[in-house]
């Protein structure tokens, strides 16, 4: 259940931070000595500002080595939505959990910077393959490098190992076959040099856990929402592959505009509350049952964390996300999902959500 739309708001920006590097690393074989930064390919995060120049310089060198390759990648290809091997959602969730843990350990300021770099890069996308400008390519890689350097190596390695466990060994060779081989190899060598600079600047200890608010109106409203909607949550097939399907009738560039609004929203979120939401999701993953449903208590905690996150963002920014998503989600999508659950449970959940929304809006800055 933690893969639903609410999670997208809570940690979607953190996932987006990694998307750029993730896709251009898909061709690499994945030796363990490359792991500290390779993990970022599937995750999120950052590093101390004191390292900005060194990592920034290294990112420019990486750009020299990899931009030709980047222009060859079809960034609009639906393959990036697919599982990197056998579809096994509960195993994949273990890898996602490691990414969330890594994200929670990251420096919130650098996460914000990385999100803003991605937003800018989306603005310079051009050409049939959907590639960003060279300057923005470098800026995104530098931002991701700083993200990774702000997380202890052990947490980065945990992501690397968990993603390796669910990735078919034939994936790297297949991805390499879609581009010019020599350009891919040159990009990979540049990546190895970049990861050495990032690892050199990596922190040894994680940041402190988030301070979680308590006794607030959003927390109380989250309990009411959870009581009203938990039966509906248990009706949902969280192990379905429907969540990997592209939105019907929409192209990748059209969908990316909505994702961009999410990134902008994420960049404006309170850093402590974002960390708290990631930690709540991590705990919720730990209590899921065989059907993918978390405990009632953890479900409530996740709802409260997301409500506080949304309240930390101006209403206009939240509405930008709502309107952009409404523009790319066909009416057949909610109708199809509604048909798969108990309608009375769905209606009760919707009523609970509307009440919760009002409390969040009243608390919004």
UniProtKB/Swiss-Prot annotation:
Residues 1-52 form a transit peptide. Its main location: plastid. Sequence repeats lie at residues 53-215, 216-365. InterPro entries: Peridinin-chlorophyll-bd_prot, Peridinin-chlorophyll-bd_sf. Gene3D superfamilies: Peridinin-chlorophyll A binding (1.40.10.10). It is found in: Plastid, Chloroplast. One of its GO terms (molecular function) is chlorophyll binding. Keywords: Chlorophyll, Chloroplast, Chromophore, Light-harvesting polypeptide, Plastid, Repeat, Transit peptide. Pfam families: PCP (PF02429). The record marks 118, 281 as: Chlorophyll a binding. GO terms for cellular component: chloroplast; light-harvesting complex. Water-soluble antenna for capture of solar energy in the blue-green range. Peridinin is an asymmetric carotenoid. Monomer. The mature protein is composed of 2 almost identical repeat units. This is Peridinin-chlorophyll a-binding protein, chloroplastic. It comes from Symbiodinium sp.
């Amino acid at each position: 259940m933690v893969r639903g739309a609410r999670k997208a708001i809570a940690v979607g920006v953190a996932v987006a931070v990694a998307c750029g590097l993730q896709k251009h690393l898909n061709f690499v074989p994945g030796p363990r000595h490359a792991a500290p930064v390779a993990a970022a390919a599937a995750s999120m995060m950052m590093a101390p500002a004191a390292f900005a120049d060194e990592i920034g310089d290294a990112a420019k060198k990486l750009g020299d080595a990899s931009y030709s390759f980047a222009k060859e990648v079809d960034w609009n290809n639906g393959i990036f939505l697919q599982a990197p091997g056998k579809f096994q959602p509960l195993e994949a969730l273990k890898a996602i959990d490691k990414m969330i843990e890594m994200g929670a350990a990251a420096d919130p300021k650098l996460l914000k910077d990385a999100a803003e770099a991605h937003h800018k890069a989306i603005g310079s996308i051009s050409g049939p393959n959907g590639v960003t400008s060279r300057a923005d390519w470098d800026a995104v890689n530098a931002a991701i490098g700083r993200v990774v350097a702000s997380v202890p190596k052990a947490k980065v390695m945990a992501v690397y190992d968990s993603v390796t466990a669910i990735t078919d060994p034939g994936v790297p060779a297949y991805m390499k076959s879609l581009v010019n081989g020599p350009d891919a190899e040159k990009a990979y060598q540049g990546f190895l040099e970049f990861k050495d600079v990032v690892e050199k600047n990596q922190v040894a200890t994680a940041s402190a856990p988030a301070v979680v608010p308590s006794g607030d109106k959003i927390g109380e409203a989250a309990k009411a929402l959870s009581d009203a909607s938990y039966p509906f949550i248990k009706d949902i097939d969280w192990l379905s592959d429907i969540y990997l399907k592209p939105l019907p009738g929409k192209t990748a560039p059209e969908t990316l505009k909505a994702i961009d609004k999410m990134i902008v929203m994420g960049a404006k979120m309170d850093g402590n509350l974002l960390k708290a939401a990631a930690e709540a999701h991590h705990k919720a993953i730990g209590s899921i049952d065989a059907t993918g449903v978390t405990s009632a208590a953890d479900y409530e905690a996740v709802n409260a964390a997301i409500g506080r996150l949304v309240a930390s963002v101006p209403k206009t920014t939240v509405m930008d996300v709502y309107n952009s998503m409404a523009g790319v989600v066909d009416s057949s999508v909610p109708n199809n999902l509604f048909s798969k659950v108990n309608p009375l449970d769905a209606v009760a959940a919707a009523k609970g959500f509307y009440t919760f929304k009002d409390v969040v809006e009243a608390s919004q800055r």
